[in-house]
């Protein structure tokens, strides 16, 4: 499954179908990866279903937007590499899921089936098999001559994972079939759901607590995780159950039943557990009655479900109806609304995530909902809190969304605590809410750094990335990475121990560590984890690992400036942007003082990125952390004078256009430069000097200049502009052969590594990009080039092999023919 990056701004609007479809694909693929591969879904099923249906409708309306990686062509998630792959003889297709669970939804499905079968009002009702939609992990069990020979997960619907050894530990699943009428099929694939009963889940968590181990979140994820344990002994410790509900490949079954219901009866006779909560019903009204009956008893069931499934009962009619795309026409799943309950908000706090995201959280009077006791519920972000107007003291509806993530759905306003307005009529007092609306804190509750929220983003973030303890582990992991400071040997386990055992409070502390610190840390970590290394048992202390680690830390003290900037973890600053900063501004001293308008003058730096960089360096705690690194001996290499090409970007007209003055376009900025030829003159410009500008632009500019902060920003920009002009050489350096060109690398080159090729291209002035577009000048393709090569050919982008790239690099500047 492809990995996608989180969008830098909100989703594209629906009036931009191509961009909207691309965004939907990226979101759905990310959610599917979390759900099927990581077993850590971040959104409820209802959100995935909503986005999926939107993409499906969009691709129906615009067939040209469907791409090979579209989730509408898939059934589930990717196969984990630890298990052998199993190709399903008959694909394990998913059933269409409807969120319209009213009577109209069931009737609409019945009407669709009748229409497909060509039935009219005079024909009898269609018979359906109605059953439960279990909340577990789908499994295919293969029996040959009556014996279990293989068990596989759904995987992506075509290829699953071989989990036979783990499935054999589930006592409900027969290892051999019981003959029916003295017969078992030659080949029988039975499909069903592995799940965990609620009481078994509670007992398992009780055992975990007794052992002092981490408890599990919910039965579904616990069951899925158990099936995918590499050690079958660990899987055997989890109390798993199974229900059969369908068939895969079948061969040599004498007297195979003619209906789905009778097929389940025979599976039960073969020895498979089949849920008793099922029925054969007539027509849409029968489906509605079944749906309502199960809804009424849902909470009393011994296991979790998230809906019901309707299937045309006749197997012959199923074959006649067939499939549409990835789903059968003869079946549909109807979900129930997520379970909800009323409770009271005791307080609203904010949590700081490992990447600095600030999330409001409602602390609740404990309430039992969705099978668990909920004490906290996410409020998502500042906009959501304001939209719902959630306040302390409110009675709220809490939903265990997707049966996983508790959230506040809405406020019961008529129960909001009120106070009398002071001084109002004694006999007819006016009232006002007792508690004020929620306000996001201006500073991080963990470290005190400023909280910033980028324009167009819903999430606010702590700006103290180098300082904030909530972000400390993530900041160090990034800082030490191979493409950043490349600290050899400093892996995740050591970072966790250094932070958790209080050896490292800031990144600079890495460079103060001693051999004794590492050895003591290892000893304390082993004691905490109950581990006794063999060397300790033998009366020895291993030191080589610590010596190597210290050498790796010391060796990282002189990184190239661009890599050092990348290592700081500035939001939106990747390798390419870090290189741009280093190449154009030349020194850390210049970069850490550059305001957003100056940064906007650099190539490929947009408003969002410029603001993120400026915000990072504007945070005093980040500056302190940076100074601490320099004092610890870190010395970025390759600093130089500012790039002379920046001179034209520093013209007043160019800078005026980057100030962010409303209505001051690039054209108006040039007019303004005539009236105010220098930044100092702009700071004190008089209205009569702006007669050449439209009245609305003049008014907007004067309002902007009335701000003390804006005038201070202008003075800072003017001073730094003067320093840059004084420091830069009189003429630009000689251009490289690929100066200003965009190149994409794809596939495996015969002699050069990807990093080596990238370095050579960048040395020649090229920008190395990760994706092919109309702006790409060259694609350098090696073996197994894949989709990027296909995209280049589609866009008529020139394609080079390694030899062609090397030949191009030898040409004189300006000659790329």
Swiss-Prot record:
A Pfam family: DNA_ligase_aden
Gene3D superfamilies the record matches: 5' to 3' exonuclease, C-terminal subdomain, 6.20.10.30, BRCT domain, DNA ligase/mRNA capping enzyme, Helix hairpin bin, Nucleic acid-binding proteins
GO-annotated cellular components: cytosol
Active-site residues, record numbering mapped to chain: 133 (n6-amp-lysine intermediate)
Residues where NAD(+) binds: 45-49, 94-95, 131, 154, 193, 311, 335
Functional description taken from the UniProt entry: DNA ligase that catalyzes the formation of phosphodiester linkages between 5'-phosphoryl and 3'-hydroxyl groups in double-stranded DNA using NAD as a coenzyme and as the energy source for the reaction. It is essential for DNA replication and repair of damaged DNA.
PANTHER family from the UniProt entry: CHROMOSOME TRANSMISSION FIDELITY FACTOR 18 (PTHR23389), DNA LIGASE (PTHR23389:SF9)
Family from the record: Belongs to the NAD-dependent DNA ligase family. LigA subfamily.
Name of the protein: DNA ligase
Origin species: Ralstonia pickettii (strain 12J)
């Amino acid at each position: 499954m492809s990995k996608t990056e989180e969008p830098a701004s909100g989703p594209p609007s629906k009036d931009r179908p191509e961009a909207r479809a691309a965004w939907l694909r990226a979101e759905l693929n990310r959610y599917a990866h979390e759900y099927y591969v990581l077993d850590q879904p971040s959104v409820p099923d209802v959100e995935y279903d909503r986005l999926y249906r939107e993409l499906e409708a969009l691709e129906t309306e615009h067939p040209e937007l469907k791409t090979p990686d579209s989730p509408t062509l898939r059934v589930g998630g990717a196969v984990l590499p630890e298990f052998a792959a199993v190709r399903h003889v008959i694909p394990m297709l998913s059933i269409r899921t409807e969120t319209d669970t009213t009577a109209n939804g069931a009737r609409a499905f019945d009407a669709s089936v009748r229409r497909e079968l060509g039935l009219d009002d005079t024909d009898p009702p269609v018979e359906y098999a109605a059953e439960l939609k279990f909340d577990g992990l789908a499994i295919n069990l293969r029996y040959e001559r009556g014996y279990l020979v293989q068990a596989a997960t759904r995987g992506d619907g075509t290829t699953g994972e071989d989990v036979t050894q783990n499935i054999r530990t589930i006592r409900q699943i027969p290892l051999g079939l019981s003959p029916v009428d003295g017969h078992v099929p030659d080949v029988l694939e039975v499909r069903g759901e592995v799940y965990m009963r609620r009481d078994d889940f509670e007992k398992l968590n009780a055992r975990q607590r007794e052992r002092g181990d981490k408890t599990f979140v919910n039965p579904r994820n616990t069951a899925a995780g158990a099936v995918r344990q590499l050690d079958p002994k660990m899987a055997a410790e989890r109390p798993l159950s199974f229900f059969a509900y369908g068939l895969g490949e079948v061969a040599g079954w004498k007297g195979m039943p003619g209906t789905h219901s009778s097929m389940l009866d025979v599976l039960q006779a073969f020895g498979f557990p089949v849920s008793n909560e099922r029925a054969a019903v007539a027509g849409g009204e029968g489906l509605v009655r079944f749906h309502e009956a199960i809804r009424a008893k849902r909470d009393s069931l011994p296991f979790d479900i998230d809906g019901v499934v309707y299937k045309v009962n006749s197997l012959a009619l199923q074959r006649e109806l067939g499939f549409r795309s990835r789903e059968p026409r003869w079946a549909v799943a109807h979900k129930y609304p997520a379970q909800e309950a009323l409770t009271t908000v005791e307080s609203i706090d904010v949590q700081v995530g490992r990447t600095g995201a600030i999330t409001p959280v409602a602390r609740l009077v404990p309430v039992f909902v969705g099978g668990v006791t909920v004490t906290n519920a996410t409020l998502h972000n500042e906009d959501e809190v304001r939209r719902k107007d959630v306040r302390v003291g409110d009675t709220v509806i809490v939903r265990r969304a997707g049966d996983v993530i508790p959230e506040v759905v809405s406020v019961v306003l008529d129960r909001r605590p009120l106070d009398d307005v002071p001084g109002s009529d004694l006999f007819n007092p006016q009232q006002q809410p007792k508690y004020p609306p929620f306000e996001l804190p201006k500073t991080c509750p963990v470290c005190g750094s400023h909280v910033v929220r980028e324009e167009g983003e819903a999430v606010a973030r702590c700006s103290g990335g180098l300082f904030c303890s909530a972000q400390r582990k993530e900041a160090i992991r990034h800082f030490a990475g191979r493409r950043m400071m490349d600290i050899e040997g400093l892996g995740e386990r050591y970072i966790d121990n250094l932070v958790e055992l209080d050896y490292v409070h800031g990144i600079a502390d890495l460079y103060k560590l001693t051999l004794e610190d590492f050895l003591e840390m290892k000893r304390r970590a082993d004691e905490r984890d109950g581990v006794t290394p063999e060397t300790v048992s033998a009366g020895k202390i291993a030191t080589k690992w610590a010596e190597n680690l210290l050498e790796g830390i010391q060796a990282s003290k002189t990184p190239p400036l661009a890599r050092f900037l990348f290592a700081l973890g500035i939001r939106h600053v990747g390798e390419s942007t870090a290189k741009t900063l280093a190449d154009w501004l030349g020194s850390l001293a210049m970069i850490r003082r550059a305001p957003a308008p100056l940064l906007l003058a650099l190539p490929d730096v947009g408003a969002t990125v410029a603001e993120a960089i400026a915000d990072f360096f504007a945070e005093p705690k980040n500056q302190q952390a940076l100074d601490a690194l320099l004092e610890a001996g870190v010395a970025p290499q390759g600093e130089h004078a500012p790039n002379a090409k920046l001179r034209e970007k520093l013209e007043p007209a160019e800078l005026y256009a980057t100030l962010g003055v409303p209505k001051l376009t690039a054209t108006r900025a040039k007019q303004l430069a005539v009236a105010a030829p220098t930044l100092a003159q702009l700071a004190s410009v008089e209205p009569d000097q702006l007669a050449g500008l439209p009245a609305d632009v003049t008014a907007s500019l004067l309002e902007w200049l009335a701000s003390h902060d804006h005038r201070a920003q202008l003075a800072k920009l003017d001073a730094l502009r003067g320093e840059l002009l004084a420091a830069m050489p009189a003429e630009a350096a000689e251009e490289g052969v690929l100066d200003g060109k965009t190149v994409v690398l794809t596939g495996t080159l015969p002699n050069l590594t990807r990093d080596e090729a990238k370095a050579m291209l960048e040395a020649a002035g090229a920008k190395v990009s990760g994706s092919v577009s109309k702006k790409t000048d060259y694609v350098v393709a090696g073996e197994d080039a894949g989709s990027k090569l296909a995209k280049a050919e589609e866009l008529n982008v020139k394609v080079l092999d390694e030899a062609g790239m090397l030949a191009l690099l030898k040409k004189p500047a300006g000659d790329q023919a």
